[in-house]
């Protein structure tokens, strides 16, 4: 019963990465990727225990950024480029949370999609 010992898988060290922040009206999704777009770590407000309307709060976005950044730092990530999109109110607090993580930020890009008279917007809610 000879067992072969496998070598431990070496963790990649990535120094330059991109942070994709999607701030919708209902949730915040954060993904850290390398320059080619391969995901390093990701987190969302729902996955961090926030339910319902609490997922769309700035505090939930801050916690989400902290969790995803913690995982990304294990890969040696130091320099990031930020791509933020979506209409949510969490955008500003997500940015502040990223600046508090001691990353070197090279660029900030707003990638929110803007309709140029495409599909008809959903009707207004009457409360």
From Swiss-Prot:
UniProt entry tagged with the keyword Repeat: no
A Pfam family recorded for this sequence: Ribosomal_S11
GO cellular component: ribonucleoprotein complex; ribosome
Superkingdom of origin organism: Bacteria
Alphabetized SUPFAM superfamilies for the sequence: Translational machinery components
UniProtKB keywords: Ribonucleoprotein, Ribosomal protein, RNA-binding, rRNA-binding
GO process terms (BP): translation
A GO molecular-function annotation: structural constituent of ribosome
InterPro entries: Ribosomal_uS11, Ribosomal_uS11_bac-type, Ribosomal_uS11_CS, Ribosomal_uS11_sf
NCBIfam families named among the record's database cross-references: PRK05309.1, uS11_bact
Assembly behavior: Part of the 30S ribosomal subunit. Interacts with proteins S7 and S18. Binds to IF-3.
Family, similarity comment: Belongs to the universal ribosomal protein uS11 family.
Function description: Located on the platform of the 30S subunit, it bridges several disparate RNA helices of the 16S rRNA. Forms part of the Shine-Dalgarno cleft in the 70S ribosome.
Protein known as: Small ribosomal subunit protein uS11
Taxonomic source organism: Rickettsia bellii (strain OSU 85-389)
């Amino acid at each position: 019963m000879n067992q072969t010992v496998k070598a431990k898988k070496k963790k990649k060290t990535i120094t330059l990465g991109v942070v994709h922040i999607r701030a919708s009206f209902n949730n915040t999704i954060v993904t850290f990727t390398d320059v080619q777009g391969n995901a390093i770590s990701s987190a969302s407000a729902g996955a961090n225990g926030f339910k319902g309307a609490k997922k769309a709060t700035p505090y939930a976005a801050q916690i989400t950024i902290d969790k995803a950044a913690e995982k990304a730092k294990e890969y040696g990530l130091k320099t990031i480029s930020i791509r933020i999109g979506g209409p949510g109110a969490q955008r500003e607090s997500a940015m502040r949370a990223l600046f508090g993580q001691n990353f070197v930020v090279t660029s900030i890009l707003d990638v929110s999609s803007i309709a140029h008279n495409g599909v008809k917007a959903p009707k207004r809610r009457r409360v």
